[in-house]
Curated annotation (Swiss-Prot):
Family: Belongs to the TOP6A family.
Record carries keyword Transmembrane: no
Keywords, ordered alphabetically: DNA-binding, Hydrolase, Isomerase, Magnesium, Metal-binding, Nucleus, Topoisomerase
Cellular component, GO annotation: nuclear chromosome
Gene behind the chain: SPO11-2
Expression induction: By auxin and benzylaminopurine.
Biological process annotations from GO: meiotic DNA double-strand break formation; meiotic DNA double-strand break processing; reciprocal meiotic recombination
Name listed for the protein in its UniProt record: Meiotic recombination protein SPO11-2
Free-text function comment from the UniProt entry: Required for meiotic recombination. Mediates DNA cleavage that forms the double-strand breaks (DSB) that initiate meiotic recombination.
Cofactor: Mg(2+)
EC supergroup of this enzyme: isomerase
InterPro entries, sorted: Spo11/TopoVI_A (IPR002815), Spo11/TopoVI_A_N (IPR013049), Spo11/TopoVI_A_sf (IPR036078), TOPRIM_Topo6A/Spo11 (IPR034136), WH-like_DNA-bd_sf (IPR036388)
Amino acid sequence: MAEAGVAAASLFGADRRLCSADILPPAEVRARIEVAVLNFLAALTDPAAPAISALPLISRGAANRGLRRALLRDDVSSVYLSYASCKRSLTRANDAKAFVRVWKVMEMCYKILGEGKLVTLRELFYTLLSESPTYFTCQRHVNQTVQDVVSLLRCTRQSLGIMASSRGALIGRLVLQGPEEEHVDCSILGPSGHAITGDLNVLSKLIFSSDARYIIVVEKDAIFQRLAEDRIYSHLPCILITAKGYPDLATRFILHRLSQTYPNMPIFALVDWNPAGLAILCTYKYGSISMGLESYRYACNVKWLGLRGDDLQLIPQSAYQELKPRDLQIAKSLLSSKFLQDKHRAELTLMLETGKRAEIEALYSHGFDFLGKYVARKIVQGDYI
């Protein structure tokens, strides 16, 4: 009953293979939580049902993942989850705590939404740690359980009242107009740029004005600040954006909004030449596996500008580094995925064959002003994949 009652609440268009998470108002999310509770209680009182009902969740395992491929060259491909399910059961030893965690998080979300508040994952962790220390001993427990709740209720994380913890920033040829009519001219800011709020509701209401021709996604904050300090956007009409490492939800959200507002503005990624850099690019391009139910909402058609294998001739041998065990682990995961395109796979294979990795900073061997020239040259020459 729980599976039918909650799962039937949302369908993803006409494609029944794809399962999605809806953007919902607080009242609707609270109603879905109430339905889940009622279904669970009904199962407990049904003589024909098992003594303890299991929670039906959409599986995030590899067998249930797929890639919705773009039909046209400039369209966006994205990761999706199909309808294969898994269960959290109180009767299985390995699942018992995870089963309880789902109810604890739903209880907390019900309270948060009733109070009209938003909390970060970190705030949620410390609250649950103080109230239920037996079940929540690390941040990972909260992160995984939130995705379980998203899977059960089929609503987005933001709809649960959980706000993204944004590290992101942007700068360049862009003016932001907020809901209170305030304007931010991102072309006159210091090299740290404009901090991206974690509140997706605020980001969804921003009005953009731009004469840029390109968007450049930068992996590292230090590289972002170098390009901003050089004011690359003064001679190359562009917007710079960074998540300062692995892309957080808010940075992906605003990048997607920019791509929707300016569909003819190409997006380029500047990442390290290592498996982690490619993984970051793929998250922007296809979405996150862990958030498969809502990944399609944030996927963008991102091109790989650099670093790439063709750029290694610009880097001195002394700047190469050995691949680390973590690099090999990421590479293995990427190679086994369904979405890695051929040219990306070739780059990853070259990394493994050479056993080397290189960071963008290695280009500083040509001087600090070389980076901006490198980026501009590659864009103008169409040197990206």
